[in-house]
Structure formats: structure tokens, C-alpha cells
């Protein structure tokens, strides 16, 4: 809830779109920066992440809320090739994305936290670990297990056998 509250309050449309997209999809900072307009399919509500880590493509779901945020951003900035443009219509830099996280979430946070938080939120919502593994593009479920941090509230609400 902390991240959702923080993202909701951001007024800068580009910054809000970057953080909302990253948290919602679990995309890596490089994937967000390399994302092209043609990678977003708003009819099928999916995003194709091309040639990511391990040189593999993968597909992630696009939430209606994030699509709305992206459209609001797009109307304000009119990016061309890349979803998030930096100077001279080049892709937005990973350094800039990391600075956005620190600006809005705090200096102790980093962009990769959004990916971990996405995995944890999916697990706590009951998503199977194998689905999360595929969603994040992990070759091993061991890597996915590192990403998922079960909250104390989830442990307290567990249905114990006795």
C-alpha cells in the first residue's frame, strides 16, 4: 500500500507513469527504458518485453489503471519511438529512473525494489510461484523465491492446521 499511495500522489506525469508501470509489471529498469511504443498492445492489454536479460522475449499483463496513466502521460509528452523519451528523443536513462525512485520513495530505495514489491504483491494475492517466475522472466524458481518477501500480516492471517 505504501508504494500505491506514493505513486498516486505524483503529479509529474512521466515520473508517475514510469513508477506505476514498473511496480505493476515488475519490469527491470533497463526494460522500462528500452520499451517502445510498438511493444504495448492496448487491445490485448499486454506488453512485450523484447530481448531482456538472457536475450529472451516475454509478455506481461497491462492493467487498465496503468494504461490510463500511460495515456495521460502520452498526451502530455507525445513520445515517439520509446515510451519514455529522454533528451533528443533518445530513450530515457536508467540513471534518471533511479533518481525518480529516490525522489519519490526515499533515498534508501532503488528501482529494483519495485520489481521485488511486484513479486511479493502477486504472491500475497495468491498467484502461483511458477506464474510469478514466468512473469518476471526468471529461468529458476529459486531466483523468484528470493524476490518474494512474505509480510508479517500474511503470516498472521495464515490458516494453520491446528
Task: Identify the residue ranges that each predicted region occupies.
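Conserved catalytic core of the tyrosine transesterase superfamily
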Residues: 1-162
Amino acid at each position: 500500500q505504501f508504494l500505491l499511495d506514493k505513486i498516486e500522489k505524483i503529479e509529474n506525469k512521466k515520473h508517475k507513469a514510469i513508477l506505476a508501470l514498473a511496480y505493476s509489471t515488475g519490469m527491470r529498469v533497463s526494460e522500462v527504458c528500452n520499451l517502445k511504443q510498438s511493444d504495448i498492445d492496448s487491445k490485448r492489454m499486454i506488453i512485450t518485453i523484447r530481448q531482456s536479460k538472457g536475450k529472451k522475449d516475454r509478455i506481461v499483463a497491462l492493467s487498465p489503471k496503468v494504461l490510463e496513466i500511460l495515456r495521460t502521460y502520452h498526451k502530455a509528452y507525445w513520445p515517439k519511438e520509446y515510451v519514455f523519451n529522454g533528451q533528443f528523443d533518445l530513450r530515457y536513462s536508467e540513471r534518471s529512473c533511479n533518481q525518480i525512485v529516490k525522489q519519490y520513495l526515499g533515498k534508501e530505495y532503488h528501482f529494483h525494489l519495485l520489481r521485488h514489491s511486484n513479486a511479493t504483491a502477486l504472491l500475497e494475492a495468491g498467484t502461483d510461484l511458477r506464474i510469478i517466475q514466468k512473469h518476471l522472466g526468471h529461468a529458476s524458481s529459486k531466483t523468484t523465491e528470493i524476490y518474494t518477501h512474505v509480510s508479517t500480516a500474511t503470516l498472521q492471517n495464515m490458516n494453520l492446521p491446528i
